[in-house]
Amino acid sequence: MDSVEKGAATSVSNPRGRPSRGRPPKLQRNSRGGQGRGVEKPPHLAALILARGGSKGIPLKNIKHLAGVPLIGWVLRAALDSGAFQSVWVSTDHDEIENVAKQFGAQVHRRSSEVSKDSSTSLDAIIEFLNYHNEVDIVGNIQATSPCLHPTDLQKVAEMIREEGYDSVFSVVRRHQFRWSEIQKGVREVTEPLNLNPAKRPRRQDWDGELYENGSFYFAKRHLIEMGYLQGGKMAYYEMRAEHSVDIDVDIDWPIAEQRVLRYGYFGKEKLKEIKLLVCNIDGCLTNGHIYVSGDQKEIISYDVKDAIGISLLKKSGIEVRLISERACSKQTLSSLKLDCKMEVSVSDKLAVVDEWRKEMGLCWKEVAYLGNEVSDEECLKRVGLSGAPADACSTAQKAVGYICKCNGGRGAIREFAEHIFLLMEKVNNSCQK
């Protein structure tokens, strides 16, 4: 199958029948240049993320939301934005993972059941992929569970392979940890130091530490993989920053990784702008979408006090908050909530109203955030600089946003999105200071 460049339509490769368990067939490598030309094309470097659906530690962890983004989305964003690859692929056996991969712009290789077992290795899946992609010369196997990966890391490794002639490069992190031998009853009754002299314990600043694989990626040329290696030949490591070295394996890793990715993760090519306006849909974001009617036929709605506090905090930080609804909500009822927010109801074209508000405040779209949950919010969500949706938003809204809340609408989603805005604004301010 021919590869497609980044940004082109996604495609799927589907192994037919059982793949060969041996080495891929040797290719007849003619000149990689065009017909009648002696100039060779650069080797085809493909990013490959392995993401089977049968994870035992955390079910479907590859698409579980981490900081509002499917886990696999963090590394796909970094790989696609790096510009280092001729193609970016996800190898999976699961429909939901395939759909998420396509949404982010990756191509999909449907792996066979033979390499989707608990006993299958990464090498098995990579060899199967190469069996169906003769155009690929180098594979960058990127781990979906490393969400703090940045495009610059991948660009530098691609350069090491292409320009410096390395056959394989893998990621490491430097650690300053003293290691001791394990005590085993009947074998070793006392422990011994493995990498230090206890009589001369070095200070951290006086010790270079040691290099450990962090599992973020393994790049290798095709001929090595065909021989059964991901590390070999002219080999080198790439040292990643400690704060970017995150690996998720079990549930306990998740909250730690979430905090790390919010502070050190890669959020895309577009430079973040300071948010000046947040627009929230009323029904399903401010409220849970339920409407109660009193005995005298008056409309009653409820909202979460946490969301009111979130709105107050946003306003205190200088961010205008406005409310919008396509329904003919009672302004009197909304006013009784004492949120002190400008609002528009019975809106048939939300994008037009938000655009008017934006122009009124002299803002560009990148300075506007939007929290929506319905199909009618889709265009606004796609247009603004920062978009979010409650956990129970419709699928159309969720597909259009950059952040999906853990909280449902009317149950803390606004407060959660406010905290997300504050964290991103902190990143903006820090980058400006640098």
Curated annotation (Swiss-Prot):
Stretches for region Disordered: 1-42
Residues with N-acetylmethionine modification: 1
Alphabetized UniProt keyword annotations: Acetylation, Methylation, Nucleotidyltransferase, Nucleus, Transferase
Omega-N-methylarginine sites (modified residues): 37, 52
GO terms assigned for molecular function: N-acylneuraminate cytidylyltransferase activity
Residues at the catalytic site: 201
Residues given in the record as substrate binding sites: 52, 62, 111, 120, 122, 143
Catalyzed reaction equations: an N-acylneuraminate + CTP = a CMP-N-acyl-beta-neuraminate + diphosphate
Residue span of motif BC1 motif: 15-31
GO cellular component: nucleus
InterPro entries per record: CMP-NeuNAc_synthase, Cytidylyl_trans, HAD-like_sf, HAD_sf, Nucleotide-diphossugar_trans
Metabolic or biological pathway, per its Swiss-Prot or TrEMBL entry: Amino-sugar metabolism; N-acetylneuraminate metabolism
Chain coiled-coil ranges: none
Compartment annotation: Nucleus
Motif (BC3 motif): 269-276
Name of one Pfam family that matches: CTP_transf_3
Gene Ontology biological-process entries: N-acetylneuraminate metabolic process
Record text about domains: The BC2 (basic cluster 2) motif is necessary and sufficient for the nuclear localization and contains the catalytic active site. The localization in the nucleus is however not required for the enzyme activity.
Record note on quaternary structure: Homotetramer; the active enzyme is formed by a dimer of dimers.
Family according to the record: Belongs to the CMP-NeuNAc synthase family.
Function: Catalyzes the activation of N-acetylneuraminic acid (NeuNAc) to cytidine 5'-monophosphate N-acetylneuraminic acid (CMP-NeuNAc), a substrate required for the addition of sialic acid. Has some activity toward NeuNAc, N-glycolylneuraminic acid (Neu5Gc) or 2-keto-3-deoxy-D-glycero-D-galacto-nononic acid (KDN).
Protein name in UniProt: N-acylneuraminate cytidylyltransferase
Gene that this sequence comes from: CMAS
